[in-house]
């Protein structure tokens, strides 16, 4: 799934999500993206951490959309990327970022055999 979101300042950000997204996310940030989004019992402290997760996810999906060499991503590159945005840019657009990711996880195949 590929999409473009518009940040409040009018800046467009391309995002792409695919089967590799959660693995690339874990590779760089050491967190299990599937577990984060599947855990519905979050307390207030965990919800604050989710804001960081959304920004990190936006970085991974933007890197995929831009065709970057995903094996070379680093925390320094993440911080450099962040310097191009305002502190709240991705938090304000959190639902859009999450929707791009989640739309890539939906099953789109249809059953080949009809149930009896």
PLM region descriptions:
Residues 1-11, 23, 27, 31-48, ...:
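Charged interaction scaffolds used for protein-protein
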Residues 18:
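Residue-level signal for threonine
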Residues 52-64, 96:
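Short, hydrophobic/amphipathic alpha-helical patches that form generic packing surfaces
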